[in-house]
Every structure is written in structure tokens, then in C-alpha cells.
Amino acid sequence: MRRNRLFPTMIEFSRAAYDDVVSHASAGGDAEVCGVLAGTRGDDGEASVVTETYRAENVADTPRTRYAIAPEELLELIERAEDDGFDVVGFYHSHPTGPTRPSETDAARATWPGYSYVICALDGSPFVGSWRWCGDESGFEQETVAVRGER
């Protein structure tokens, strides 16, 4: 994956938002969980900052290996984030037993260039990684994940 300087390469979580992603993923058991990340979206090389998570229902036909957010719920969550005064930063989902990186299915279903796709992998200790979708030609670019100390 080549580096695209148009998009930031770092995502920073508040401690509360990071903990909520891990908690949601852990509570999902064998099924993938998903949601929307909100806060301040970084442009031109600035880090995006996630301060809010909006949990969604996974409506995929095979939730153990896939995730999907119903279009109506996705629109509702985006509107809620915007009404709360936040930018949509990206999306998250879990890989209960899968890899710590995006799968081929994740890449095939990514549709928001410039936004972050966060994965909480649970095979062993929870691992939170983030990848910026750079479009069909460039694919995903891994981002550095940072967590602020305050709650």
C-alpha cells in the first residue's frame, strides 16, 4: 500500500472512545460488532480525533465473519453525530477470531475514501488498528493509533 499524503496517517482516540470500541467488541462474543466513529476529522496530514462512538446493530447475514449496518441506521447515526456537533471520522468493527488487518471483504466493501476503518481484533489480547481507505486504486493505508490518557 502506498502512502497518500492527502489523508492523515494518524488517528487519536479519547480514552473513553477507545475503551468503548474494545468493550463493544468484547461483548459481541463470536459475532462481529460495528459502529460509527465521530469527533474531529483531520485533513491535509492532521490527525483525526475520535471522541465519540455510536454503536450499530450488525445486520450481516453471517455476523461471525461479516458486518453490515442497515442504511437507515447508518444515516440515523451520522445525523446524530452531526447534530451532536461532531464530524464522522470513520467506522469500526471487530474481528473476533480474524486478522488484525482489513480482510479482502473489508476492502471490497469500503466506500468512504479518506475515512478511517478501525478493527478491534480479539484473537488474544484486544488489538485496535486503523486503516484509511484511499480508494479502489490505492486501497487501505495503515494509520498510527494513539490514545489520550484522560477519561
Regions picked out by a protein language model, each given a short descriptive name:
Residues 93-95:
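Histidine-centered divalent metal-coordination motifs
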